[in-house]
């Protein structure tokens, strides 16, 4: 099981969890070559919909950093109205899963995170009856999968631009974005430079998106010939592979079993046995090691 990094708030004890709730889910950091991808959810009683709209949540990408921080603080102070939960999927976990022998796609990782958040909220006894999500992959297929997994939720809508259409998804988007920014800005970059503890790692890496020239420059300047990069970087991204190719040492993996057989006797029974064992009819019961 992955070591989860979770940030959350809990509803005030005065809130009746049995009344119908609306829940929204969105992510931040899907595309960057560095740092975590964060999934966030927000949930509130449907009866508080008017209050939710008055809080003026919006797509986190359309807000300034200051506006996001202010709204996030307001969310933390409003546990009689709503609560949030986030799932931080580190670059290390993304690299590990996407570089398996049978790779797990980013879409599947995203779906698993969203499903995990839904299950977490339902486990708390929250009566979620409306669920809105920003799509990952084909909306209809994703929506059908969720309806089969959660038949107890009366209404499930998966759509493009959900963070601009539904305030509850906008709130989830803000939670995900602020938590991701916090994770990045509060990293100890000296620790991340595990290859040379005396050398400070530059934090001037721009947005972290593959198209950002500053991010590309950082990847070229900070690569190690043997280890490549600290685990803050997503090794499963094509941008990382391109930056390392030709500049870092390659590794040739021997996969064929027959190349290993030359070091061992194929038939252990062919080995000469001591006379003592033969005379006493003692057999070897272990054929493998």
Swiss-Prot record:
The keyword Cytoplasm does not apply. A divalent metal cation binds at residues 26-27, 134. PROSITE patterns: RNASE_H_2. Keywords: Endonuclease, Hydrolase, Metal-binding, Nuclease. Manganese or magnesium. Binds 1 divalent metal ion per monomer in the absence of substrate. May bind a second metal ion after substrate binding. Its EC number is 3.1.26.4. It comes from the Eukaryota. GO terms for molecular function: metal ion binding; RNA binding; RNA-DNA hybrid ribonuclease activity. One of its GO terms (biological process) is RNA metabolic process. InterPro entries: RNase_H2_suA, RNase_HII/HIII, RNase_HII/HIII_dom, RNase_HII_hlx-loop-hlx_cap_dom, RNaseH-like_sf, RNaseH_sf. GO terms for cellular component: ribonuclease H2 complex. Pfam families: RNase_HII (PF01351). It catalyses: Endonucleolytic cleavage to 5'-phosphomonoester. Gene3D superfamilies: Ribonuclease H-like superfamily/Ribonuclease H, Ribonuclease hii. Domain 2. It is an enzyme of class 3 (hydrolase). Its cofactor is Mn(2+); Mg(2+). Belongs to the RNase HII family. Eukaryotic subfamily. PANTHER family: RIBONUCLEASE H2 SUBUNIT A. This is Ribonuclease H2 subunit A. The lineage of its organism: Eukaryota, Amoebozoa, Evosea, Eumycetozoa, Dictyostelia. The gene is rnaseh2A.
């Amino acid at each position: 099981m992955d070591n989860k990094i979770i940030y959350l708030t809990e509803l005030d004890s005065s809130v009746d969890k049995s009344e119908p709730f609306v829940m929204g889910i969105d992510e931040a950091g899907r595309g960057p070559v560095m740092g975590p991808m964060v999934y966030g959810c927000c949930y509130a009683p449907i009866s508080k919909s008017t209050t939710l709209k008055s809080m003026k949540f919006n797509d986190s990408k359309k807000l300034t950093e200051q506006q996001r921080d202010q709204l996030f603080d307001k969310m933390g102070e409003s546990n009689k109205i709503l609560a949030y939960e986030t799932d931080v999927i580190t670059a290390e976990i993304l690299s590990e899963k996407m570089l398996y022998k049978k790779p797990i796609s980013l879409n599947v990782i995203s779906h698993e995170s969203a499903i995990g958040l839904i299950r977490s909220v339902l486990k708390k006894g929250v009566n979620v009856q409306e669920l809105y999500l920003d799509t990952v992959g084909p909306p209809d297929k994703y929506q059908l999968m969720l309806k089969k997994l959660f038949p107890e939720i009366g209404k499930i809508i998966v759509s493009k631009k959900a963070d601009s259409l539904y305030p509850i998804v906008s709130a989830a988007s803000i939670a995900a974005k602020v938590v991701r920014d916090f994770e990045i800005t509060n990293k100890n970059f000296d620790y991340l430079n595990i290859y040379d503890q005396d050398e400070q790692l530059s934090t001037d890496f721009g947005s972290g998106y593959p198209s950002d020239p500053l991010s590309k420059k950082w990847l070229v300047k900070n690569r190690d010939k043997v280890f490549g990069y600290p685990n803050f970087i997503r090794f499963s991204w094509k941008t990382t592979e391109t930056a390392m190719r030709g500049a870092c040492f390659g590794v040739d993996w021997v996969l064929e079993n027959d190349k290993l057989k030359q070091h061992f006797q194929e038939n252990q029974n062919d080995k000469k046995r001591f006379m003592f064992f033969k005379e006493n009819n003692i057999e070897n019961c272990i054929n493998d090691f």
